[in-house]
Curated annotation (Swiss-Prot):
It comes from the Bacteria. Gene3D superfamilies: 1.10.10.200, 3.30.70.980. It comes from Microcystis aeruginosa (strain NIES-843 / IAM M-2473). This is Probable transcriptional regulatory protein MAE_13580. Keywords: Cytoplasm, DNA-binding, Transcription, Transcription regulation. The keyword Transcription regulation applies.
Length: 254
């Protein structure tokens, strides 16, 4: 049942993991707003909101800010901007597929900023659907600590997980990521916690169905710069791409 995600996140390969997706207080607060609007303002009955709040607390966001974001999402906060979730798609250098999730109150301004970022780094912003078919939307649960594989396999089968993969590095420590269908994320999370696993994070993630191996140093440099530029944009929540650096490039300071 063990699986391996080749993307397994380019940020992991470049030791950028938990600065993870470079999410700022603003981005995390917006995630709470949208999660509230998509469900109910009570985290007990809204798994998306509950996980958004957990991420915010882990990042050190004060409770007052979290409560304010929930109020905005529930429509009980004055002067509230209407944020909407939008997925943008494009190509990086060498035809690498890039998927961007954004929360924005001005889709034209966000699209213009993304288009500029792509064009300055050898890529181009495409039409909706141009690369989306190259990715699967999955629920991902990240476990921490030393893990017994037999125990994980048993819990994964009970929780109807699709696959899992282990990680062990100086930057991340030890643990595993367990993958499942989006609709099964909350159920699997409960099963894994009940089995005694330490759940660090439960999230939805785009996983590339296939990856392109990048061996050219210049292409890799432009790709990483493009990813960094996209992630730094205010309304961008996440960036996923379908490339994998060869080992020699991972050891270089690009």
């Amino acid at each position: 049942m063990a699986g391996h995600s080749k993307w397994a996140n380019i940020k992991r390969q470049k030791a950028r993991v938990d600065a993870k997706k470079g999410q700022t207080f603003t981005q995390l607060s917006r995630a709470i707003i949208v999660a509230t609007r998509n469900g109910v303002p009570d985290p007990a009955g809204n798994f998306q909101l509950r996980t958004a709040i957990e991420k915010a607390k882990a990042a050190g966001i004060p409770n007052d800010n979290i409560e304010r974001a929930i109020a905005k999402g529930a429509g009980t906060w004055e002067n509230d901007s209407a944020f909407e979730e939008i997925r943008y798609e494009g190509y990086g250098p060498g035809g690498v597929a890039i998927l961007i999730e954004a929360l924005t109150d001005n889709r034209n301004r966000t699209a213009a900023a993304l288009r500029a970022a792509f064009s300055k780094n050898g890529g181009n912003l495409g039409e909706t659907g141009c690369v989306g078919w190259m990715f699967d939307h999955k629920g991902v649960i990240r476990l921490e600590g030393t893990i017994d594989e037999d125990k994980l396999l048993e819990a994964s089968l009970e929780g109807q997980a699709q696959s899992y993969e282990f990680f062990d590095s100086e930057e991340e420590g030890q643990g595993a990521e367990v993958f499942t269908e989006v609709s099964n994320l909350e159920r699997l999370n409960k099963v894994l916690q009940a089995a005694g696993f330490k759940v660090k994070e439960a999230e939805l993630r785009w996983i590339p169905t296939n990856t392109l191996e990048v061996s050219d140093r210049e292409q890799a440099r432009f790709l990483l710069k493009l990813i960094d530029t996209l992630e730094s944009l205010d309304h961008v929540q996440s960036v996923t791409a379908n490339f994998d650096l060869v080992e020699e490039l991972m050891l270089l300071d690009l």
